[in-house]
């Protein structure tokens, strides 16, 4: 299959609201030659990254918008525009190959439309975009609701946040301290000719000069190292783990933090890791097996404690709550296409429900670390503020890290070009069992 068609079909599923790019793309990658998989991936992720900008350009070039049933043609047009403005593919090849894919859509009218619009884009696109630059949606390539939210919440940083969201993310490793120190693993990378340096905040983190195939990393198959962003790595030390503790990782998939907690403290009495979907726990088990670690995995709704909790209290809880994922857009650019403004209040409600449900499972004197990969205070400091107000037995603790910006509650890490993702942490201690 032509990589342009494969990318467009994956993107069409996203545009139709049927899938994320991570779930729709693998099936399409299986249909292209192995040598074209890199191009297919770039076309899909690159188009998603710049979709808000390309969509407004397409609106200028089209006489009328696409119907919902024509998401495949819309996606193919966006892939064509991405090639013209963001790749080194010669214009004649980008247009010819993209238009040629239209035959596979079984929509006879699509070929002529794509040919006309892409050729006009080649002639007039740069001038049209220049005239649209005043629109922050065009300038930042972020949907309007998100651009406005970031500007409102982060008036001094919002443009830098958008720039970081549009940048290619660095590849960051987490060294398994059960096997090597970070310095020792840096030496192994140097011996292998792989450029790398220590992360600023995570004691286990290493940022690679260039992304590489994990199979080329020393000891990857043996569990010496994993791929995980620096911001997500902070949870292991912030939780203040100690031997004999019973730990809960709520909403644990894909298991990176579960594994890191087990690596960080070999003497834990018990690790319970839960997630809503059983199929997502398969990935958690694969990660545990590669690292030769073990945890009790349970598929359940964390809010329904009667269905999974055995009544034995936890000394530590990590709640990496479901969120808008606005801090990891650079890794999942289709978030720009799928997330909507009205998702945020619903997510904040869910986050509060999770805190309320899990709090009774925490031992008096125990700690709960609340985390999200969101950059929106509605899901972060405001959720913690509301929880503290309704929970007399909860107190907030300072976070032992300089990462991020201090907030009224917790700390907010903003995505940085070449650095960590956007993330939020707040740490709570249970000082009394009763709740008002």
Curated annotation (Swiss-Prot):
Any Gene Ontology CC annotation: cytosol
Positions of transmembrane segments: none
Key word Cell membrane present: no
Molecular function as annotated in GO: RNA binding; rRNA (cytosine-C5-)-methyltransferase activity
Broadest EC class assigned to this enzyme: transferase
Keyword annotations of the record: Cytoplasm, Methyltransferase, Ribosome biogenesis, RNA-binding, rRNA processing, S-adenosyl-L-methionine, Transferase
Active-site residue list: 373
PANTHER family linked to this entry: NOL1_NOP2_SUN FAMILY PROTEIN _ ANTITERMINATION NUSB DOMAIN-CONTAINING PROTEIN (PTHR22807:SF61), NOP2 YEAST -RELATED NOL1/NOP2/FMU SUN DOMAIN-CONTAINING (PTHR22807)
Sequence positions that bind S-adenosyl-L-methionine: 251-257, 275, 301, 320
UniProt organism field: Pseudomonas putida (strain ATCC 47054 / DSM 6125 / CFBP 8728 / NCIMB 11950 / KT2440)
Top-rank lineage group of the source organism: Bacteria
Protein name, as recorded: Ribosomal RNA small subunit methyltransferase B
């Amino acid at each position: 299959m032509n990589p342009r068609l494969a990318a467009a079909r994956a993107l069409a599923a996203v545009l139709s609201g049927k899938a994320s790019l991570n779930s729709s793309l693998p099936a399409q990658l299986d249909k292209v030659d192995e040598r074209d998989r890199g191009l297919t991936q770039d076309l899909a992720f690159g188009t998603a990254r710049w979709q808000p900008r390309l969509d407004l350009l397409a609106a200028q070039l089209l006489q009328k918008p696409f119907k919902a049933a024509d998401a495949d043609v819309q996606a193919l047009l966006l892939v064509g525009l991405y090639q013209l403005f963001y790749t080194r593919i010669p214009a004649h090849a980008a247009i010819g190959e993209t238009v040629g894919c239209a035959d596979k859509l079984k929509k006879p009218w699509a070929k002529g439309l794509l040919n006309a619009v892409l050729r006009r884009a080649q002639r007039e696109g740069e001038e049209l975009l220049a005239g649209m630059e005043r629109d922050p949606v065009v300038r930042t390539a972020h949907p309007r609701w998100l651009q406005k939210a970031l500007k409102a919440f982060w008036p001094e940083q919002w443009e830098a946040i958008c720039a970081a969201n549009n940048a290619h993310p660095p590849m960051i490793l987490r060294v398994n301290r059960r096997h090597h120190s970070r310095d020792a693993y840096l030496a192994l990378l140097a011996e292998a000719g792989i450029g790398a340096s220590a992360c600023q905040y995570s004691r286990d983190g290493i940022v690679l000069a260039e992304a590489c195939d994990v199979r080329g990393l020393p000891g990857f198959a043996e569990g010496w190292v994993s791929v995980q962003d620096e911001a997500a790595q902070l949870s292991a030390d912030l939780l203040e783990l100690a031997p004999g503790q019973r730990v809960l990782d709520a909403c644990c998939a894909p298991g990176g933090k579960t594994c890191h907690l087990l690596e960080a403290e070999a003497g834990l009495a018990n690790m319970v890791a839960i997630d809503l979907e059983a199929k997502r726990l398969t990935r958690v088990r694969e990660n545990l097996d590669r690292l030769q670690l073990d945890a009790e995995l349970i598929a359940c709704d964390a809010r329904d404690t009667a269905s999974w909790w055995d009544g034995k209290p936890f000394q530590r809880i990590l709640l990496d709550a479901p969120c808008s994922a606005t801090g990891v857009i650079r890794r999942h650019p289709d978030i720009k296409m799928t997330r909507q403004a009205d998702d945020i209040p619903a997510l904040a409600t869910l986050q509060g429900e999770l805190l309320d449900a899990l709090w009774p499972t925490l031992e008096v004197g125990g700690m709960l670390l609340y985390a999200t990969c969101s950059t929106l205070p509605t899901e972060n400091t405001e959720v913690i503020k509301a929880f503290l107000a309704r929970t007399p037995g909860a107190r907030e603790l300072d976070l032992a890290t300089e990462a991020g910006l201090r907030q009224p509650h917790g700390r907010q890490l903003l995505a940085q070009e070449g650095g960590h993702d956007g993330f939020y942490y707040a740490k709570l201690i249970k000082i009394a069992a009763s709740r008002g």
